[in-house]
Amino acid sequence: MISAVEKIREFMKEQGVNFLLVNSTNKYLEEYTPLEENSRYFLTDFSGSTGDVLVTFEDIYLFVDGRYHIQADLEVNHDIVSVVKLQTGQTFLDELIKKIPQDGTLGIFAKKNSQTRVEYLEKNGIKLKYFNNDPLDKTIDYDSSNIVKVDGVSVEEKIKNIDIDGAVLITNLEEVAYLFNLRDFSKNYSSKIRGKAVILAGRARLLDDIDDFVESYNGKIFVDKSTINAYDYKLIGEKVEVLSDSPIKLMKSVKTDDEINHYIEAFKRTDMAVKAIRDYIENNDNISEYDIAERLEKEFKRFGAKSLSFKSIVAKDKNSALAHYSKCSKDEILKDGSLVLIDCGAYYEQGLATDITRVFVKGNPSELQKRVYTTVLKMFLNAYNSDLKVGYDIDNLARKIYSENEIDGFVFNHGLGHGIGVSVHEYPPNLSKNEMAKVEIKDNMCFTIEPGLYNEDYFGVRLENSCYMKDGKIKSFVHMNYEKKLIDFSMLTEQEKQWLKEFEVL
């Protein structure tokens, strides 16, 4: 049987391109694309949620950010795949461009790249050749019979103030699910529905695809270039008008008071599930990562979860240095002194994703474990209790705290936080060194604060609370206690001790 690598290079030869971009996403540009739809996974065996591939006839370059440096090294065949490790502040597109010579042409799959991305590449001198179909694609039928209605502001109320002379096309799946108050809990790790939407003349319609609508409608069609794929953009042609942002994006990110109240209740149940796991770890011997992950899902279901919001990360010792470790091995048994990082979340009745990370220790911790844990805790406490409202600035503050308490060999190699909602990763808001984080976080926006420190020779610690902004102050949905055994209280200032005391309830 021909391998994926052979198949993709045969395609390149037939199409006359020496460079081909293979994506981790699908035509909806989903971040968490199921692996059975993930062409990058077929090529590289890398199972992370993000990270695209440049294929040449000599090499395959896998680009990954700091969350996946170690995981990529562990999963790929290095005789075939070269891992390009993006550092904080580096972007995938800029590093990709460096690998394309001036006279080179890059083949791309139009349905799997946003219009914003292709315009950036062209602006930077990259000649593109578009292909409509990816030869590695597998046909996956979507069963819409599982879609359910959830409570929320009506579609009519949401769109009544959209005053645009033409049709507005919504192509982001989170926005579509939000707009129609529809969810699909039939698969783990998502509550989104699949489809696109058009808003026209005070009404909204749900579409499977846009082809028939584009052909029959003669007016202007307004789009968000960051969420529409290049195929759909070109299909619209001269009818296209560009929006600076989808009118649904900001609306979705600023939660209603009812949504905030749902989240408060959902996180109470999430806290209880994690507390049950803490007790399970404390009171049982010879348990594995796999045992904990299985028990965790049962606890979520016991407290009413519809499904998990992402695949739980249960990582002990060195595995915890992989920011998005996802194996949960039966062979990784907790021993005395084992550190275990648990990053998890669930969907409840409203289909909004919860997200929390805690780190526990089996038995007695080492001094290094306590030092790293307490440093991460200091980063969280200072970021959480600041009066800052811009994600970029909050991220900088956490990094400043680490620079004042640096630990040799441990790195903080990801952003401080992300928005949450219908998906576990949403924008806005964003807390990172990225330019898109340089905007103010508005009241009722929901987001995570999750500093972490990692050393692949030892372990990693990440502490994550999902939060919201209220009256210009950050409030936490999460109230699960921190691991007292891992806190070196001598490292905390009196202010930090007081903050910790005020925060914890479980």
Say what each PLM segment does.
Residues 1-506:
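Active-site neighborhoods and metal-handling regions in enzymes and metal-associated proteins
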